[in-house]
Amino acid sequence: MKTTSFGKIEWQLDEAGKDNVAKQLGIGNAAFHLSNQTSTDHLLLPGYRLPEGIHSFSSIGELQKFIAPYRLQQSDDWINGTFEYDSAQLEEELSRLKAAFPFLQISIIGHSVLDTPIYEIRTEPVQHLHSIHLNASFHANEWITTSVLIKWLKSLCLAASDPVQARHHEAVHILRTTALSIVPMVNPDGVDLVRNGPESLGLSSEEFTPLHGRYADYQEWKANIRGVDLNNQFPAYWEIEYYRHQPKAPSNRGFPGREPLTEPEAKAMANLALRKRFDRLIALHTQGEEIYWGFLGHEPAISKETVKRFEQVSGYKPIRYLDSYAGYRDWFIYQFHNEGYTVELGLGKNPLSMNQFDTIYEKTKRLLWEACKC
């Protein structure tokens, strides 16, 4: 991942003085401590975007005066704006996120067919009580879900970093108690194909004609770059999905592969869940304003109460059982008997127009905040 370099503050910081420095600089305690767990000679300031370079000060007053203009605000374009991402733009955004909020941990959990990194963003809590996983862009033409998830993450990080933010105490509680795992773009090759066309990937449109048929562009494309639907790839009654559905060959949508977990993107997501065994999973898709929450009775009893809370804050309709198998959420519930939810954002035809973004975001952000309450 390319590194965005913001400024560093040269400062000798001992463990005993951390609380006092955080208070004087107006930074949330949890965010400050998690950002400065290892650094002893430089201060890392979550919620600030400092100019490049190493800056030295003789007093806390000088430091306060210097950093004041660089504090991030909820009204800032980077926090409150609407952004669209392909895989390269997402990589740059993750670098900016890490620089602005150093308590975030960013790693690569696998690679796509075309060797594009699949990133996970994590928070490591002070007291690990819960683990929650969020993902987006399993399907290529549902890339708007990445935009929604990243915008919400910025609001969470800012709220944790700045005590004057309305949701500060809620965000601090999440940082202190919850291990968050976020995969913002499961299908980077597919997103790049939909957004930029095959030439951007070094491929020709002729290669996709047998898979894509009569369509003039790639707006209908859901699958990965090999024409496998990643959300039909998981070993939860996969055979039913394979035998009852067309196509039986690679396609722009629907094809579940010749067997489960043939695709590197699906393997990466399965391995992540097997390693982490999350308490709760939220998969963002489009569209329909619905929440799928059960799978053949394998879901825990608490799911019924949780989805009622999601409905109350978002207005989305809960649906317990769906005539569908082999999805990531299906497999997660089947494998672990833990809470899993597919949230279908917005209304209309994929890919949803960005004209809907504000409406989608307002409903989804409330659901995501609620999802982090365990």
Where are the language model's segments positioned?
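Extracellular LysM carbohydrate-binding repeats and other cell-envelope/extracellular binding modules
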Residues: K2-E10, I27-K65
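Second-shell loop/turn segments in exported
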Residues: G17, V21, D77-Y85, F138-H139, ...
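Stable alpha-helical elements in mature extracytoplasmic
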Residues: G17-V21, G28, L90-E93, T145-W152, ...
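Short glycine- and acidic-rich boundary segments immediately preceding or forming the N-terminal edge
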Residues: H55-I118
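Proline/glycine-enriched tight loop/beta-turn segments at coil->beta junctions
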Residues: T116-I118, P125-S131
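Short hydrophobic beta-strand that contains or immediately precedes a catalytic carboxylate
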Residues: H133-A136
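Active-site/substrate-binding loop(s) of hydrolase catalytic cores
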Residues: I144, K151-L153, C157-Y292
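Metallocarboxypeptidase
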Residues: Y237-C374
